[in-house]
Amino acid sequence: MSQGNMTGYLPGDPRYGLSGEALRNYYRAKPAQWAIYCWDKPGTQATRRALLPNQKRYVEDFGERVIGYGHFVSDDGRDTLGTSFFMQLDDRAAADKFLADEPLNKAGLYQRVEVHRWSNSFQKRQVDYRRKGLQQFLCTGPKTGTPEFFRAHLHAHESYFAAYGDSFIFFRGPIRSADGADNIGTALLLELPDRSAADKFWNEEPFAKNGGYQKDWHITRWVFGD
C-alpha cells in the first residue's frame, strides 16, 4: 500500500484515496443529513410520557429519511434526558421545519436543541441493525487542531474503528460545516457492555488520545426510540 493511502481512509470506503478539495467535494455532493439533539427541561417526565406515542408516529411518517431515532438516558438507564434524531433532509430549512413540527418541541418540552449538519459514513439506518442486547452510547465532540493533525492520525483512526467492527450500531460520521464541506466534529453510536467500555473506546481512539477534540465532548447513554 502506498504511503499516501497509509495516511487516509481504508480500502472499501468511498472516501478511499480522497483528500483536500476532492474530499470536500465528496461531502458537498452527499445528500444533507442532520444530527438533532433535544435536551428536556427538568420536571417534564410526565409530559414526555404522555406525548411519546405522538412523537413515534411523527418520526414514522418520515419513512426512509429516518437514519436513527432514540433517547438520551442517565447512566443507570432510569431517567430520560432527551431525544435525538438522525435524519436525511434536503437542507437546513427542512431540518428546522422537522424540529418545529415535532410534538415534544411544539409542547415546549425541550430546554436546549442542537442541529448539526452531519454525514453517516456507514450508509445504514437503524432498521438495518441487528441488536445485540447490550448498552448503547452516543459519543459526540467538536474537533480541534489543524487539517495536518487529522491527516496525520486519520489512518490510525480508521483502523481503530475497523477493529471495533459491529460494535458500531448503524452509524458513525463527522459533523460537517453548514455547507457540508468541512469536518468539524463527530457523532457515533456504539453498542458495548457498559459505560467503562465506552470510556475505554473513547480514551484510546487516536484523535481523542492525541488531543483532537475540544473539552466539551460527551459520552451519553442512549436507547432506541422505536
Where are these regions (language model features)?
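Conserved, structured core segments of small domains
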Residues: 2-226
